[in-house]
Every structure is written in structure tokens, then in C-alpha cells.
């Protein structure tokens, strides 16, 4: 192809997708320069050299994918789709409630790329802002529950309850213990997730009223709901004590708004508390994303699932925050991990923490009190109207069984309200009852409207209610109230004015490095552009305010959105069916393996329980296998980083009768397209197994090869990687699965929505379509890029990675290469020689990169002592060169150590990163200059990102674990570290 022809192709692509040139970083001329350096004449021939010929598709799939367009057209089309959602006032409850997101939090956090484009805070020195916000979140949860350890969020309440069940099961050492007792008042979606998670582990669920629980040595745990699904408040102390008497752990699923008023659940004896902070300022968004929480006793700190933020000290002795106790997590412990959770819901946890900062304890209590009093007034009105209402203590919800129910629902619908239909799952006209849940948005006028509806249905005059005055709240809730002051930490009192809160948010943003500052070249993470046009629609009321269990005729917009994405993802991957329910890659993995397991069981092959996993696999893979009830058998990799075919064949044959699946990542975790992927799939199929393809690296394949056509049976897709949902500092994510036709009947279902297959595995996530509220992001990306644009993006992602490998190879060995000496979309740089020659660890390079203004690549994975670099298609040639210049300059610094020019212990690498405070200190006792420390590149004198703290002492933080802000009393004790916030 001549240069003129290439320009014509580019012009055609730009015309068909005006957004394309905004998304792809290198210009056409830049791409030509990069290709020239790599020895290729055009992108087409370059891609043909990278992708194995037996899987390469020469044209983009187009049967269902649209042509690309500009952001204005895409947004207009999405506006029409959104308009098909009819937002009514939903008083359904069941874990999802109306809430008011403070405008400042919406504008400065949810819609702020400085917050939503950051990565999980593994590099803590440049992540102090969101670590502080998460520290506040953990403090909030710990104070709410009275439990000393709280994590930094989980995916949803159902998942959190399942993790509590798993922890209780793992802690119990009695071999006969296999029974988990569940409160009959638990939320239906939570019960569904529990059932899905319990069966593969051999756990027997028993659902009953807590007063009828049968305790014996076979019981390892209980789950109680407070308040219950019907709104009931009750004292769980007796049930918890009974559990403890047989050595079982007690988990209580709580409503955080109710917990604001009542005594902390720890005072009733709970070992674990779980729940969702959705009603703390996070929109319902048709089911998610929302941050769940998990709090427990200190003795279980090493079994807690998910991330845990702890306080330590830096090299200057100053307090600093970092992720604590990481050795319990999947990326280190693999199949021995406490959980497979990786991405959680950091952005939503941050929003909830700022909601608490915004309102403070008094503001939260005022909201909870208003909700409680409205419920009490409604109950009085129901009694006056003659409705049969049980006289029990409640918080926000009342359920009524009555013959007038169909008329109540009809009148409510005409007035613009959705009420809970009882029994759950039936049509309103067939209802035997109704439920009403008040929330933060409820008002006296809303109560009057509801009473008018109820009066009309009952044929009675509207009751006139006297003001309750100042009632004793303890009589209304039937439980001890919170007695001691809570949330007394300064952060929950200092920022009452919007001016002060705005400045606090801005101070925290300044302590975090995100994509607004520069490239984040994390391998296997795909930190690409999250365009503003893609993010704007998630705040539209039509998407943000819809209840996940609203009547189907109000949700046509979401139905269209889901349908489009399912069709497009099926086309892109070459599969027959898609489920959007998994709300993280880890949950996509679990869903995929459970689908495979269900298929085997449907064929009478229950003995198939072995999963082959390459030793290079991501830690979530083996951790997920264990959760799916499968046994992990490792498969070796050869010297080139590929799956060892001989070892695979040997293991597959040895375990043939028990072989359930192979989990394989493609391109491999070593960053190459393995040429024998078809042979691998055929080998596994030949022994009766299925092939699960981890889609973490799908960005290298779009438009050029499809897992469903080269042999995989199921694949999960990370929308927060390949399809532009931002990482949010550690979530939200979406991890749909795409499956072959024979697996479609087993796609996950849900008890309250029509989704999944006829023999579906059950709910993986609490909401039917998982984190539906952020699906518009991926819809916008796909709509604007179009089939050819997606193909172009993958080509440039491959080109950029190979350009980096080419430029850096003279300075750092590139560990693995595929055919023609090329890598895929990422490359691994070997830093191990520097340990031998200069005494440097990979962490020294990672921390020094901060001084150059970069987040480090993925460190020591999949090979210890290396970094894995993934530039994505969105970074410009200028930015790629800036990163290369930084890495080359660092190599020159290491050479100075090797030659003896600088001290091997006291040098810019071993002392990195360098803070503004350190560089401007009165005393400078280092053998290199302040300029060498802070401005290693001349351009940094014009624009410089400063690490907030010096290198953090991780070991100190784990030995002296502190996971929440100290109280005023604790701060008076000099043995407690001062919190980082001033």
C-alpha cells in the first residue's frame, strides 16, 4: 500500500468516525514514523506480522456493529434511548433507595477525570488523595458498625454477604460443619447470590426465621438482616449468642442509614457486618455500581476480602497511607487467597465517604430520623384507613397484605409511584399486598400523596394526622439507640461549608497521579482514554434514577442499551450469547467457570472438577477456580513464555476423565500472541474439557481475531479496560461473559428479572444487569468508534507497545517476543540484571519513575523483578517518547551506580521518590543535587507532579495495622499515629 493509499484509508476512517482521531493518540504521520522504525510499511502488514495467520481475520466484523460517528450524533442517539426509560418515584426499597447526591460531589468526584481515571493505589506515594478518601470510608463503616476492621469496598451487598459466608466457612475447622443459616428476611437478591456461591463449595443453605434456627456442630455461620426485608427491626442478640455457642460466626447485613440511629451492630455481638452504602449519595442507576462494605473483628484481619487501606510512615517519619496486608490477596496468594476480588467499587466508596463528610454525623442522623418519622406517620395512617398492619418495630419500610393491593398499585402508578409488589415477582394486578420504603427524598407532601392513594383504594377519606412532635425514637425502632458520640474525627466536622469541602477535595486530587497528568503504562490494565462524551450520560436522570426492580414497561431504554451491547460484544468476540450481569472481571471469571461446570453437570459429568491453569496466569484465575468448586492443576510455560504444549498434553491426558476446563489468557500474560492457541483449544476439547479465555488482554484482538472462532468456549470482557469504563481508582468495573451456543442455556439469571438462560446458574451479582448505570460509557465508545475504528484502535495499541519495546530494548532486555520478534499490546522489561550489577530492586525503578512524573508499569508480574508496560492506543507519540526518555535516563543513573560514580546506597533511585518538602528542606545531606532529585528532565521545571509522601515503610504498616482515623481519645495517646488529614 502506497503512502497516498494509506492517507486515503485514514481519511475514510476519520470521515466515518470523527471521534477516532480524538481517541487514538499517534497521528497518521506519527504512526508512519513508528512503523518505519519497526521496519514495516503499513499497519496492515505490521498486524499480519504480529497476529498468528491461522487466527487473523482480514476484515472487521460488521454485521451488527454500526459505523462510527461523532460524539454529538452518538449522544443524540443515546438521548433517544434514555428517553425510553420512564422514571417514576420508586418506593420499592429492597436495598435500592432514592438519594440526593450533593452537587459538589457529582461535579468534583463522579464527573472529575482526576478521580475517575486513576488506577488501584498500588503505588501509594502518588495515591494519597484517594487513599485518604478510602481511609475516611473505612472509618465511616467502622464507626457505623462498631467493628474495628473495615475494607475499602466490595462489589455489592450480595457479594459481601457471600464473602462473609466464605470467610465463616474458611475459619471453621470442624470437618462436619457445612450448614449456613440465613434469615428469611434477607434481601432476595442477596439470597440468590448466596445460593450461587454456596453450592460449588458444598455449603448447605437453610433459610428460616432466626427464632427457629436449629444450631448444632454442623453450623459454621449465620446471616441476619437488620432491618429485615419487610422493614422489621429486632434484637438479634439471642440468635448471635446461639451461633457463638456452637462455634459459628454471626454476620449481620445492615442498612447504614438505620445504623445511624440504632446501637452499633457490634454491640449485639456481630462478628461481621455487611451492606451497601448506595443510599449515601450514590444514584440507584438501575442496580449499580454501588459500594458494598465488609467490617469485622481484628482477629479476622488477614481473612478480610478485598482491599484494606492502612496507615504507616514514610522515609521521613511522616504518616502515610497504603494498601495493607496484601499477602492475603489473589495476586499473591492465588488459589490460597481469601477472595478473588480485584476491582471493587472505589469511586463509589469515595463518593459515599464524601457524602458523610458533607453531612457529618448530625446531618446523617437528621436524614435517618426524618425517614423513620415518615414511616411512623404512614403506619398511623394505614391503621386509620383500616389496613391490616402488624404492630412491630420498623425503620423505613412497611409491608401490607390486603385485598385492596391491586387497586393500590393501580392508583399509585397513575400518581407516578412504584410500590413494592407482594409477593415479589408477580404482576401488580395479581398482587396480594404492597410495600412502601421511604428514603432521603421522601417529604411530608409525598406522605400525603401516598395516603391519598391508599384512601382512594380503600374507599375512605384521607386521614388527617397530627404531628408526632418529638417522640421517643427508641420506642419507634424497638432497639437500643446509639448512645456514644460517633464520627468525632475532625474530617467529619471541619468541612461544613461548600467552600471548605471544595478545597478539601481539591487538596486530595492534588495528591493523586491519574491520566490527567500522564500515561499510566500498567501492563494488563489497559489505561486508555475515558472520553468526556462517554462519561456524560451516566449522570442523566433517565439512567441514574431508575430502580432495578421498576416495572419492565418503564425500562425500555435500558433494555435497548443491553440488547445493543449484547449483540455488539457477541459480534466482537465471535460468540453466540452474552451476559452483562458480572460487575467485575473477577465475577466474570466466576460466572464463566460456573457456566462450564453447569454444562458438564447437565451431561451427567459431575466428576469433571479439574481446571488447568498456566503458571503465568493472573492470581484471580486460581482463586476463582477454588470458588467454583474446581481443583487447580498448574501447567508449565516454556522459555518463550508460551504454554508448554507437552506439559499441557500430559496434564490433560492424566486428568482427562476429570478435566473441566483450561483457563488461558490471550494474548498471553507474557505479552505475546501464542501461535498454537488453536492447537491448545483442540487439545483440551479432545479430552472433554472447555476453554475459558481470560479477556484481560482483549484490547489486542478487536477486529483481528475472535476467541469464539479460534476455539474458546467462554470469555469474560473487562469493560473497564477494553471498552473505556474508567478504573475509578479501583472500580467500578464490568466483566460480562460471552459464551458459545451450547453454553447459552446456563447464563446467570436473577429472581426478580427475566434474564439468563433456561438452566441459568443463578445470580452472580445483586442486580440483574450488574453495574448497568455505567453501561452507557461502553455504548458511547462502541457507537463512536464503529467496527473499523475499533480495529484501528487495536492496531495502534499493538504498534505503540512494539515501538516502546524497540526503543527500550537497547537499555533493558525485553523478555518475551512472539513471531517475527514482535510483542502484542504490552512488553516485559527485565530489571533483574540491575539487582546483580547495582543492587537495585524493581521497586527502586518504580519509585524513581514518580520523580519523572510517571506511574510505574505493572511491577514483578508475571515475572518477579520485571515491569510490564502497556501504553494503549490513546497515548501520543510525544508521550511514548517522554516515557522512553525517562526509562533511558533512569538506566543512565543505574549505570552511574554500576561504575562507582555514585553511592550504591545513597542515590536518587534508592531514596526515591522525592517530595517537595524533602527537596526544599533547610538541610540537604544527600550526595546528589536537589535538581537531580526533583527535576531529572529539563521539561519538569515547567510542569511537575510531586509525590505527596516519601517512600512508605510497608512492613511497619502491616506490623502496626491502623485502618481508620483515630478517635479524639486515641489521638491523645502518643502511641497512635496522627492521621494524615489536617
Swiss-Prot record:
The glycine cleavage system is composed of four proteins: P, T, L and H. The glycine cleavage system catalyzes the degradation of glycine. The P protein binds the alpha-amino group of glycine through its pyridoxal phosphate cofactor; CO(2) is released and the remaining methylamine moiety is then transferred to the lipoamide cofactor of the H protein. The keyword Glycoprotein does not apply. GO terms for cellular component: cytosol; glycine cleavage complex. Belongs to the GcvP family. One of its GO terms (biological process) is glycine decarboxylation via glycine cleavage system. One of its GO terms (molecular function) is glycine dehydrogenase (decarboxylating) activity. This is Glycine dehydrogenase (decarboxylating). It is an enzyme of class 1 (oxidoreductase). The modification N6-(pyridoxal phosphate)lysine is found at residue 721. Keywords: Oxidoreductase, Pyridoxal phosphate. InterPro entries: GcvP, GDC-P_C, GDC-P_N, GDC_P, PyrdxlP-dep_Trfase, PyrdxlP-dep_Trfase_major, PyrdxlP-dep_Trfase_small. The keyword Oxidoreductase applies. Gene3D superfamilies: Aspartate Aminotransferase, domain 1 (3.90.1150.10), Type I PLP-dependent aspartate aminotransferase-like (Major domain) (3.40.640.10). It holds the Pfam family GDC-P. It catalyses: N(6)-[(R)-lipoyl]-L-lysyl-[glycine-cleavage complex H protein] + glycine + H(+) = N(6)-[(R)-S(8)-aminomethyldihydrolipoyl]-L-lysyl-[glycine-cleavage complex H protein] + CO2. The gene is gcvP. Its EC number is 1.4.4.2. Its cofactor is pyridoxal 5'-phosphate. PANTHER family: GLYCINE DEHYDROGENASE (DECARBOXYLATING), MITOCHONDRIAL, GLYCINE DEHYDROGENASE, DECARBOXYLATING.
Amino acid at each position: 500500500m502506497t503512502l497516498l493509499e494509506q492517507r486515503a484509508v485514514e481519511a475514510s476512517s476519520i470521515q466515518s468516525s470523527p471521534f477516532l482521531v480524538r481517541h487514538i493518540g499517534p497521528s497518521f504521520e506519527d504512526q508512519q514514523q513508528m512503523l518505519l522504525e519497526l521496519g514495516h510499511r503499513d499497519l496492515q502488514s505490521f498486524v499480519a506480522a504480529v497476529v498468528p495467520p491461522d487466527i487473523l481475520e482480514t476484515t472487521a466484523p460488521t454485521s451488527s456493529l454500526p459505523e462510527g460517528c461523532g460524539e454529538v450524533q452518538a449522544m443524540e442517539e443515546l438521548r433517544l434511548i434514555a428517553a425510553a426509560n420512564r422514571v417514576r418515584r420508586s418506593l420499592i426499597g429492597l436495598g435500592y433507595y432514592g438519594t440526593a447526591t450533593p452537587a459538589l460531589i457529582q461535579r468534583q468526584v463522579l464527573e472529575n477525570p482526576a478521580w475517575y481515571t486513576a488506577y488501584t493505589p498500588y503505588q501509594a506515594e502518588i495515591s494519597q488523595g484517594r487513599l485518604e478518601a478510602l481511609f475516611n470510608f473505612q472509618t465511616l463503616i467502622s464507626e457505623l458498625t462498631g467493628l474495628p476492621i473495615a475494607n475499602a469496598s466490595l462489589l455489592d451487598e450480595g457479594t459481601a454477604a457471600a464473602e462473609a459466608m466464605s470467610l465463616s466457612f474458611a475459619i471453621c475447622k470442624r470437618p462436619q460443619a457445612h450448614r449456613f443459616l440465613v434469615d428469611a428476611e434477607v434481601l432476595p437478591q442477596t439470597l440468590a447470590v448466596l445460593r450461587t456461591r454456596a453450592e460449588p463449595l458444598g455449603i448447605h443453605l437453610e433459610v428460616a426465621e432466626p427464632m427457629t434456627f436449629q444450631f448444632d456442630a454442623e453450623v459454621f455461620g449465620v446471616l441476619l438482616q437488620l432491618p429485615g426485608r419487610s422493614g422489621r427491626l429486632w434484637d438479634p442478640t439471642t440468635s448471635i449468642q446461639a451461633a457463638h455457642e456452637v462455634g459459628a460466626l454471626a454476620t449481620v447485613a445492615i442498612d447504614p442509614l438505620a445504623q445511624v440511629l440504632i446501637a452499633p451492630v457490634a454491640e449485639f455481638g456481630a462478628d461481621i457486618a455487611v451492606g451497601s452504602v448506595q443510599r449515601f449519595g450514590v444514584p440507584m442507576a438501575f442496580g449499580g455500581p454501588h459500594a458494598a462494605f465488609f467490617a469485622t473483628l481484628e482477629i479476622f484481619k488477614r481473612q478480610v476480602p478485598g482491599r484494606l487501606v492502612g496507615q504507616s510512615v514514610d522515609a521521613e517519619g511522616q504518616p502515610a497511607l497504603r494498601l495493607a496486608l496484601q499477602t492475603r490477596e489473589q495476586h499473591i496468594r492465588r488459589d490460597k487467597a481469601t477472595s478473588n476480588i480485584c476491582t471493587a467499587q472505589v469511586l463509589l466508596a469515595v463518593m459515599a465517604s464524601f457524602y458523610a463528610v458533607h453531612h457529618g454525623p448530625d446531618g446523617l442522623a437528621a436524614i435517618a430520623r426524618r425517614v423513620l418519622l415518615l414511616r411512623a406517620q404512614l403506619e398511623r395512617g394505614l391503621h386509620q384507613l383500616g389496613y391490616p398492619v402488624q404492630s412491630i418495630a420498623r425503620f423505613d419500610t412497611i409491608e401490607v397484605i390486603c385485598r385492596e393491593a391491586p387497586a393500590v398499585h393501580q392508583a399509585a402508578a397513575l400518581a407516578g409511584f412504584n410500590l413494592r409488589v407482594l409477593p415479589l415477582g408477580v404482576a401488580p394486578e395479581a398482587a396480594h399486598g404492597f410495600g412502601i420504603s421511604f428514603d432521603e427524598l421522601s417529604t411530608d407532601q409525598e406522605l400525603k400523596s401516598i395516603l391519598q392513594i391508599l384512601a382512594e383504594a380503600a374507599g375512605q377519606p384521607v386521614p388527617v394526622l397530627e404531628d408526632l412532635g418529638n417522640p421517643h425514637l427508641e420506642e419507634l425502632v424497638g432497639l437500643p439507640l446509639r448512645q456514644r458520640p460517633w464520627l468525632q474525627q475532625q474530617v467529619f466536622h471541619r468541612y461544613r461549608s461548600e467552600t471548605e469541602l471544595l478545597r478539601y477535595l481539591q487538596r486530595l486530587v492534588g495528591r493523586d497521579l491519574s491520566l490527567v497528568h500522564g500515561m499510566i503504562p500498567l501492563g494488563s490494565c489497559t489505561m486508555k482514554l475515558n472520553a468526556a462524551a462517554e462519561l456524560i450520560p451516566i449522570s442523566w436522570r433517565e439512567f441514574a434514577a431508575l430502580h432495578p426492580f421498576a416495572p419492565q414497561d418503564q425500562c425500555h431504554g435500558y433494555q435497548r442499551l443491553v440488547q445493543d451491547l449484547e449483540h455488539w460484544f457477541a459480534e466482537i468476540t465471535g460468540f453466540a450469547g452474552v451476559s452483562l450481569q458480572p460487575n467485575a472481571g473477577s465475577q466474570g471469571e466466576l460466572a464463566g467457570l460456573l457456566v462450564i461446570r453447569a454444562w458438564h453437570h447437565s451431561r451427567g459429568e459431575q466428576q469433571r472438577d479439574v481446571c488447568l491453569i498456566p503458571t503465568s496466569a493472573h492470581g484471580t484465575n486460581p482463586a476463582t477456580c477454588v470458588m467454583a468448586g474446581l481443583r487447580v492443576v498448574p501447567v508449565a510455560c516454556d522459555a518463550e513464555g508460551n504454554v508448554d504444549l507437552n506439559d499441557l498434553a500430559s496434564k490433560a491426558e492424566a486428568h482427562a476423565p476429570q478435566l473441566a476446563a483450561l483457563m488461558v489468557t490471550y494474548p498471553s500474560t507474557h505479552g505475546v500472541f501464542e501461535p498454537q492457541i488453536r492447537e491448545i483449544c483442540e487439545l483440551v476439547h479432545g479430552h472433554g474439557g472447555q476453554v475459558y479465555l481470560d479477556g484481560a488482554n482483549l484490547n489486542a484482538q478487536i477486529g483481528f481475531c475472535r476467541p469464539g472462532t479460534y476455539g474458546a468456549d467462554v470469555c469474560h470482557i473487562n469493560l473497564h479496560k477494553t471498552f473505556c469504563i474508567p478504573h475509578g481508582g479501583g472500580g467500578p468495573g464490568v466483566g460480562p461473559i460471552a459464551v458459545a451456543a451450547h453454553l447459552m442455556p446456563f447464563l446467570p439469571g436473577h429472581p426478580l428479572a427475566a434474564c439468563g438462560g433456561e438452566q441459568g446458574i443463578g445470580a452472580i451479582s445483586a442486580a440483574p444487569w450488574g453495574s448497568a448505570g455505567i453501561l452507557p460509557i461502553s455504548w458511547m465508545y462502541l457507537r463512536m468508534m464503529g467496527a473499523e475504528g475499533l480495529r484501528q484502535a487495536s492496531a495502534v495499541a499493538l504498534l505503540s507497545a512494539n515501538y516502546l519495546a524497540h526503543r527500550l530494548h537497547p537499555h533493558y532486555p525485553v523478555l518475551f517476543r512472539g513471531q517475527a520478534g514482535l510483542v502484542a499490546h504490552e512488553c516485559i522489561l527485565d530489571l533483574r540484571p540491575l539487582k546483580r550489577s547495582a543492587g537495585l530492586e524493581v521497586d527502586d525503578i518504580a519509585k524513581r519513575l514518580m520523580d519523572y512524573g510517571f506511574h510505574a508499569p505493572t511491577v514483578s508480574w508475571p515475572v518477579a523483578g520485571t515491569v510490564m508496560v502497556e501504553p494503549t492506543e490513546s497515548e501520543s507519540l510525544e508521550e511514548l517518547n517522554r516515557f522512553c526518555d525517562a526509562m533511558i535516563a533512569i538506566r543512565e543513573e543505574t549505570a552511574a551506580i554500576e561504575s562507582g560514580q555514585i553511592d550504591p546506597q545513597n542515590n536518587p533511585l534508592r531514596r526515591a521518590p522525592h517530595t517537595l518538602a524533602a527537596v526544599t528542606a533547610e538541610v540537604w545531606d544527600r550526595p546528589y543535587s536537589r535538581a537531580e532529585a526533583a527535576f531529572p528532565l529539563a521539561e519538569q521545571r515547567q510542569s511537575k507532579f510531586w509525590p505527596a509522601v516519601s517512600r512508605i515503610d510497608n512492613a511497619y504498616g502491616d506490623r502496626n495495622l491502623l485502618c481508620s482515623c483515630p478517635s479524639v481519645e486515641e489521638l491523645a495517646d502518643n502511641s497512635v499515629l496522627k492521621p494524615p488529614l489536617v
